[in-house]
């Protein structure tokens, strides 16, 4: 089955900070200028070129007009690239730099970079900080990166 459009999800980290777009950056927080933030609609499609059993997904914002990318450098850097999510979905390339393996763990999910195994989407405990990538720490202290997300389909 081929999708005609991306699926819509909202994401919160396990500390209940919502993901939202501000100045072309994906941040995690709850209040902005005293107003509760609803959270960005995250466009999601599967990556049809990678092993489906690993749940490979491509994540986009702004209606899928920009996609999360890990880049192609020595170490991954999370950026938003102006690429249409449906072009990645329908294209004939692996698009690993745009792909994350979604792992469900009960009510939450983690997202591991397909291009950089061992690197995960994360937030930090402080509010209104950029979403980034991290390697899982050996022991998580109070300021450890948060790699678990609630991932719920839009209403």
Swiss-Prot record:
Primary localization: cytoplasm
Reported impact of residue 123 to R: In PSORS14; shows impaired expression of the mutant protein which fails to antagonize the IL-36 signaling pathway
Transcription recorded as keyword: no
Disulfide bond annotation, renumbered to this chain: 8-154
InterPro entries for the chain: IL-1_CS, IL-1_fam, IL-1RA/IL-36, IL1/FGF
Expression by tissue: Predominantly expressed in skin keratinocytes but not in fibroblasts, endothelial cells or melanocytes. Detected also in the spleen, brain leukocyte and macrophage cell types. Increased in lesional psoriasis skin.
Record's subcellular location: Cytoplasm; Secreted
A GO-annotated cellular component: cytoplasm
GO terms, molecular function: cytokine activity; interleukin-1 receptor antagonist activity; interleukin-1 receptor binding
Induction (free text): By phorbol ester (PMA) and bacterial lipopolysaccharides (LPS) treatment in macrophage cell line. By Aspergillus fumigatus conidia in peripheral blood mnonocytes.
Single GO BP term: inflammatory response
UniProt keyword list: Cytokine, Cytoplasm, Disease variant, Disulfide bond, Immunity, Innate immunity, Secreted
Highest taxon above the source species: Eukaryota
Task of the protein: Inhibits the activity of interleukin-36 (IL36A,IL36B and IL36G) by binding to receptor IL1RL2 and preventing its association with the coreceptor IL1RAP for signaling. Part of the IL-36 signaling system that is thought to be present in epithelial barriers and to take part in local inflammatory response; similar to the IL-1 system with which it shares the coreceptor. Proposed to play a role in skin inflammation. May be involved in the innate immune response to fungal pathogens, such as Aspergillus fumigatus. May activate an anti-inflammatory signaling pathway by recruiting SIGIRR.
Subunit structure: Interacts with cargo receptor TMED10; the interaction mediates the translocation from the cytoplasm into the ERGIC (endoplasmic reticulum-Golgi intermediate compartment) and thereby secretion.
Family: Belongs to the IL-1 family.
PANTHER family, per database record: INTERLEUKIN-1 FAMILY MEMBER, INTERLEUKIN-36 RECEPTOR ANTAGONIST PROTEIN
Protein name stated in the entry: Interleukin-36 receptor antagonist protein
Species annotation: Homo sapiens
